[in-house]
């Protein structure tokens, strides 16, 4: 005998669904409320952080300055006091500061209370180079600014490089400039600066290097064998000092006899100059007004 539908079962289904939905809502409600709270807190934090002065840069501190001034750097900087600490670009600021001719490197760091700490390294000028005007060159061989009286620097001058040639072929001429700077370094390391200070270095790709001292002595080094030539030069200057002599010209550029030093000697100290001549050969020390040394 067939039975009709179970009305009690059918009637019970909607009630079970409502109870399941209620249980699910009860379980999910804490998570929903937590997410809402976090969203509200984030929105509030954003508004407070952005609109309030709590995270505004109060100070920009520059460290490592000697030549550049804080105001010059602030004029270059895209970041200023009052900018928001969290949304400024420290890399862009560092790049802008490096456009100052004296600045070699810059690192920007956020600090709290809201401020910026900028660590700077300035260029170290090693010489002047004549490029149709005097320019400063640093110890890495980079020409970085035109020299002005306010720089207050007494540096040797590198000559022999034409401005037009430098502008067109800097890469080809850079070794000449680098060689002159290396010579200055070796001159100082050998203690020669205590005997004679270099005032000018003339570089020539064909004939090599010629120096002039503050006393007016011309020193023709030529090309190659720098260390050996400086050793011989040191020995010659010591011998001249012992004899009370001063050289007008020293030749260390004899390609046929590279181990020789030809000296044109000026007058003895206290005596007038002009009684000197070039020597073609000789012994081991200054003799009279001229000599050749090995």
UniProtKB/Swiss-Prot annotation:
Keywords: Cell cycle, Cell division, Cell inner membrane, Cell membrane, Membrane, Transmembrane, Transmembrane helix
Family of the protein in this entry: Belongs to the FtsQ/DivIB family. FtsQ subfamily.
Function summary: Essential cell division protein.
Ranges that cross the membrane: 27-49
Lineage top rank: taxon: Bacteria
Domain POTRA: 55-123
Subcellular location as annotated: Cell inner membrane
Protein name as it appears in the record: Cell division protein FtsQ
GO CC annotation, single: plasma membrane
Topology term for the membrane: Single-pass type II membrane protein
Residues in compartment: Cytoplasmic: 1-26
InterPro entries on file: Cell_div_FtsQ/DivIB_C, FtsQ, FtsQ_C_sf, POTRA, POTRA_FtsQ_type
KW Oxidoreductase (keyword) present: no
A GO biological-process term: cell septum assembly
Annotated spans, Disordered: 266-294
Periplasmic side: 50-294
């Amino acid at each position: 005998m067939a039975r009709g539908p179970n009305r009690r079962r059918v009637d019970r289904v909607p009630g079970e669904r409502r109870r399941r939905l209620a249980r699910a809502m009860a379980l999910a409600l804490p998570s929903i409320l937590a997410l809402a709270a976090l969203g509200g807190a984030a929105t509030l934090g954003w508004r407070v952080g952005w609109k309030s002065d709590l995270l505004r840069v109060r100070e920009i501190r520059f460290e490592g300055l000697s030549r550049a001034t804080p105001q010059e750097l602030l004029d270059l900087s895209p970041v200023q006091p009052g900018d928001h600490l969290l949304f400024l670009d420290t890399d862009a600021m560092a790049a802008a500061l490096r456009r100052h001719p004296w600045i070699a490197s810059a690192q920007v760091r956020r600090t709290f209370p809201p401020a910026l700490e900028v660590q700077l390294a300035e260029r170290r000028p090693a010489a002047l180079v004549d490029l149709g005007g005097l320019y400063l060159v640093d110890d890495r061989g980079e020409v970085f600014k035109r020299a002005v009286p306010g720089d207050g620097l007494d540096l040797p001058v590198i000559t022999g490089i034409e401005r037009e040639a430098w502008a067109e072929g800097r890469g080809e001429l850079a070794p000449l400039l680098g060689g002159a700077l290396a010579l200055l370094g070796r001159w100082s390391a050998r203690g020669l600066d205590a005997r004679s200070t270099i005032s000018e270095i003339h570089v020539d790709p064909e004939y090599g290097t010629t120096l002039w001292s503050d006393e007016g002595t011309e020193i023709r080094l030529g090309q190659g064998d720098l260390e050996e030539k400086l050793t011989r030069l040191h020995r010659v200057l010591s011998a001249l000092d012992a004899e009370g002599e001063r050289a007008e010209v020293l030749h260390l550029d004899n390609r046929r006899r590279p181990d020789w030093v030809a000296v044109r000697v000026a007058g003895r100290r206290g005596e007038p100059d002009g009684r000197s001549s070039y020597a073609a050969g000789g012994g081991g020390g200054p003799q009279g007004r001229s000599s050749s040394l090995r």
